Amino acid sequence: MTNIRKTHPLMKIVNNAFIDLPAPSNISSWWNFGSLLGVCLILQILTGLFLAMHYTSDTTTAFSSVTHICRDVNYGWIIRYMHANGASMFFICLFMHVGRGLYYGSYTFLETWNIGVILLFATMATAFMGYVLPWGQMSFWGATVITNLLSAIPYIGTNLVEWIWGGFSVDKATLTRFFAFHFILPFIIAALAMVHLLFLHETGSNNPTGITSDTDKIPFHPYYTIKDILGALLLILALMLLVLFAPDLLGDPDNYTPANPLNTPPHIKPEWYFLFAYAILRSIPNKLGGVLALVLSILILVLVPTLHTSKQRSMMFRPISQCVFWILVADLLTLTWIGGQPVEHPYIIIGQLASIMYFLLILVLMPVASTIENNLLKW
């Protein structure tokens, strides 16, 4: 008798994706982040669902409802902080996952990579709208500043912003629609993640060498199931350490002040995971230019496969490219730091230099380094 998992229409899909899937024998812990992102997404959907049971998306009661969740709802505080810090863990995993893709040349799987970029945009949109929901000072002003950027679009800008706001400022209508979008987007992300996986399983996973691993495959279960479980346990450990010992470490104190349209906070800044993009936005003195740079800072990932000039796929055996890659990582950390600093000397010039470096590294130095390496190897 054939095993039910190989014959049942539904079980067959699960089997081919998570049990009998042929996987490379040498994939390192950098390949754990895909499954960790899945764990993060499930965790965010579950905690978010329970928060939505008690949250009210009305400007007069939103802030109070979040306070009510933390004070009066059974274990409401832990659900709220798991959701808030879960977003940080989500983005840590996302950045690691994208970094892994860049380093090991996984972007040559074009469909998988492009859907990944769409997933990144969708996750950033979800996180932004979620940050608005508690209706604190930083929620309100963050929403005002970021939505206002769309007014830089020529001709239709102002109308577009007022259409998104549902009025002439960020108000009741804005909060309600942001809640609706924040609720629906994670399910769209889950669907896109399945498509992401579908395209990945068309080609099979890449591996650290970048060389085809068709001659050396092992079954996903039990080897990588146990590895993923270990990764998930470590992720949950890190998350719970954050939640139970330093729940407000990554948050902004200004968000504990209810939203007040008449009082602007001294420093408007987003959550830490958007600071690199925020620094790029601020480094350009022109509004439209800043918005374009902001969008391009993420959209540039779509260009990476076309900029791949190396004869090798992975950076494992390419020391010059490795140097460029780690300089890029350092540059992104610099941008993250600058994004959280006030707009004054010397931060302005550092931000501008780091922004120029960011685009220069990806568009020029990466392909140049690859070409140099090809020539050194006489390829």
From Swiss-Prot:
Binds 2 heme b groups non-covalently. It is a multi-pass membrane protein. Its main location: mitochondrion. One of its GO terms (cellular component) is mitochondrial inner membrane. The gene is MT-CYB. A ubiquinone binds at H201. Pfam families: Cytochrom_B_C, Cytochrome_B. InterPro entries: Cyt_b/b6_C, Cyt_b/b6_C_sf, Cyt_b/b6_N, Cytb/b6-like_sf, Cytochrome_b, Cytochrome_b_C_euk/bac, Cytochrome_b_N_euk/bac, Di-haem_cyt_TM. Its cofactor is heme b. The chain crosses the membrane at residues 33-53, 77-98, 113-133, 178-198, 226-246, 288-308, 320-340, 347-367. PROSITE patterns: CYTB_CTER, CYTB_NTER. GO terms for biological process: mitochondrial electron transport, ubiquinol to cytochrome c. This is Cytochrome b. The keyword Mitochondrion applies. The cytochrome bc1 complex contains 11 subunits: 3 respiratory subunits (MT-CYB, CYC1 and UQCRFS1), 2 core proteins (UQCRC1 and UQCRC2) and 6 low-molecular weight proteins (UQCRH/QCR6, UQCRB/QCR7, UQCRQ/QCR8, UQCR10/QCR9, UQCR11/QCR10 and a cleavage product of UQCRFS1). This cytochrome bc1 complex then forms a dimer. Heme 1 (or BL or b562) is low-potential and absorbs at about 562 nm, and heme 2 (or BH or b566) is high-potential and absorbs at about 566 nm. Belongs to the cytochrome b family. It is found in: Mitochondrion inner membrane. GO terms for molecular function: metal ion binding; ubiquinol-cytochrome-c reductase activity.
